[in-house]
């Protein structure tokens, strides 16, 4: 169960970061303020919820195990940037993502 909460905390944190990115996207001048407030508001909600879930994780897992699991954020952000905004991800970056996933698996199996 704590693993599910950890993944959800990670996803919400990433959701908040992606909302911040979306808030910076160019728009016509007329809707800029509303666009900015919407995405920054969503970012705050996501990051606030992530923080609450993260506190639950820290009550259960040692911080030395839990914190490295947040490396999942790098994986989620890379995938989202690639899929949502069609950002180019070089092979070297994908190798880094694979190494992060490997590290998470190794650390997770030690928990």
Swiss-Prot record:
SUPFAM superfamilies the UniProt entry points to: Multidrug resistance efflux transporter EmrE
One GO term (biological process): lipid A biosynthetic process
Any matching Pfam family: EamA
Domain spans labelled EamA: 40-109
UniProt keyword annotations, A-Z: Cell inner membrane, Cell membrane, Lipid A biosynthesis, Lipid biosynthesis, Lipid metabolism, Lipopolysaccharide biosynthesis, Membrane, Transmembrane, Transmembrane helix, Transport
Lineage top rank: taxon: Bacteria
Family as reported in the entry's similarity comment: Belongs to the ArnE family.
Protein name: Probable 4-amino-4-deoxy-L-arabinose-phosphoundecaprenol flippase subunit ArnE
Species this chain originates from: Salmonella newport (strain SL254)
Gene this protein is translated from: arnE
């Amino acid at each position: 169960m704590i693993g599910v909460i950890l993944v959800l905390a990670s996803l919400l944190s990433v959701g908040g970061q992606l909302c911040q990115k979306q808030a910076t996207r160019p728009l016509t001048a007329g809707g800029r303020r509303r666009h900015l407030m919407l995405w920054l508001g969503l970012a705050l909600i996501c990051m606030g919820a992530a923080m609450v879930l993260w506190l639950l994780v820290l009550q259960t897992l040692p911080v030395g195990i839990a914190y490295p699991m947040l490396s999942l954020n790098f994986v989620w952000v890379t995938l989202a940037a690639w899929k949502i905004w069609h950002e180019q991800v070089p092979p070297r970056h994908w190798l880094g993502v694979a190494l992060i996933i490997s590290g998470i698996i190794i650390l997770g199996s030690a928990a």
